[in-house]
Amino acid sequence: MRIAEDPAAFLASLEDREAKGAPVELPGGKMVKRLPGFRRWMWDGAFCGTIGFRWQPGTTELPPHCLGHIGFAVVPWKRRQGIATRGLCDILPEAWAVGLPFVEVTTDPDNTASRRVIEANGGILIEEFALPSGYGRAMGLRYRIFRDEQEC
């Protein structure tokens, strides 16, 4: 969906706390039920990137195809300005509001910038793990940020 076609519908599509959206197509074509979640824009007067949060009601567990509760991306010309660090800090209270005692955030082992963002928010490395097929790389790092140990 393009913003210009229907701005209100586009904005509504960023917020799906009841998982009413269409199923999600995984690499390989398998369709799976959408999880509740929402996406925020990171903004400093201009668009900087997005950060999203998803969860499975009643549990901290995620389906195998969901690598973490939170994902983020910053446009290249806005990197190294603390935007992702602030964005992650800002979204954590919303994670705590759905009752999670911790969130999981994953990254590539060689993505030192994302590792720094996660660690700056209290992330603790819990494992290196093999990614499911279809993700285009072999290994990932899984961090947990605990509600009671959040550092931002």
Predicted regions and their residues:
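Conserved GNAT acetyl-CoA-binding A-motif
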Residues: A95-T107
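GNAT-family acyltransferases
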Residues: M1-P76, E94, I126, L131-C152
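Proline- and acidic/polar-enriched loop/turn elements at helix boundaries
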Residues: D90, T107, A130-L131
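Conserved active-site alpha-helix within GNAT-family acetyltransferase domains
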Residues: D110-E127
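Conserved acetyl-CoA-binding loop-helix of GNAT-fold acetyltransferases
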Residues: G71-V74, R80-A97, R116-A120
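Amphipathic alpha-helical recognition patches that constitute DNA-binding helices
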Residues: H69, F102, A113
